């Protein structure tokens, strides 16, 4: 069973104005960049994005705790998730942009592709002669979930293609 914030808690935020600031520019950037398209064809509102992100975070935490039998405390989780929601909604802290975009979506919830939460990654070409495809496979996989990938040139001229 997945984690969900209580309906009564969420109800308080549905009509509350988010403090985007910057004379409307903050909301414009949010709508363009982080608000996901819902099944009904409409974009998420801020309260929905925050709900998706917080629930996705606590789903990930719950899976980990239950997998290792660490003792999930539903009441404590609900309380701390509500505090997290409140702080994100009021922009006291914000997750990284990749977290706003990916957390709580099918990428993380169904496919387990938590790499999509990373902004960037690095791969070395130092051992190209041992495994020619490894750095390029990593680059492709990471790029496909939106991660920017940097690399070095240590493997340059370590083999000849004829």
Question: Where do the model's predicted regions map?
Answer:
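Extended catalytic cores of very large enzyme megasubunits
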Residues: 1-162
């Amino acid at each position: 069973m997945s984690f969900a914030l209580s309906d009564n808690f969420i109800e308080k935020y549905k009509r509350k104005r988010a403090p985007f600031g910057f004379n409307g520019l903050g909301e414009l950037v949010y709508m363009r960049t982080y608000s996901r398209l819902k099944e009904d064809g409409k974009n998420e509102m801020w309260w929905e994005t925050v709900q998706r992100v917080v629930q996705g975070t606590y789903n990930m935490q719950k899976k980990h705790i239950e997998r290792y039998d660490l003792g999930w405390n539903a009441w404590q989780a609900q309380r701390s998730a509500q505090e997290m929601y409140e702080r994100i909604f009021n922009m006291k802290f914000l997750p990284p942009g990749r977290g706003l975009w990916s957390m709580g979506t099918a990428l993380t919830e169904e496919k387990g592709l938590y790499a999509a939460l990373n902004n960037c990654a690095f791969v070395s070409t130092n051992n190209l002669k041992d495994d020619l495809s490894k750095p390029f496979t990593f680059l492709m996989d990471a790029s496909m979930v939106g991660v920017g990938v940097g690399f070095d040139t240590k493997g340059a001229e370590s083999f000849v293609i004829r």
